[in-house]
Amino acid sequence: MTELADILRARIAATGPMTVAEYMAECLLHPLHGYYTTRPPFGAEGDFTTAPEISQMFGELLGLCLAQHWLDTGAPARFTLAELGPGRGTLMADVLRATRGVPGFHAAMEVVLVEASPRLRDVQAQALAPYAPRWADDAGQLPEQP
């Protein structure tokens, strides 16, 4: 039995059943025993990798598609560029690098990252420092704008 299992048992004994969402949040984000808070989950040292970690092409193509959509919708003066579960920030960095030559795009965007892990927020802050991203704990905190 792991320490986290003991913590979960004690919590259930004290407060009763928990939802699957609460259980998963504890397993993934517990400050001392959570998957995303205690180890690097990505790449060679982690358990999995994603397309943006292998090649910048996906992020760059996505960025150009987003910029074209922004232009096609009249280039709104403000819009939110959000990513849910941004990992190390690699995808967003690729998107932003590919779009830096699109006049007005970066000036109009607000970069918001939906991330619950403090450790990953620190990694994302380093990767995206020039763009001053802000963070939200869940998608319900995203701004009401395009």
Listing of model-derived features with the role each one plays in the protein:
Residues 1-84, 88-144:
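Rossmann-like AdoMet
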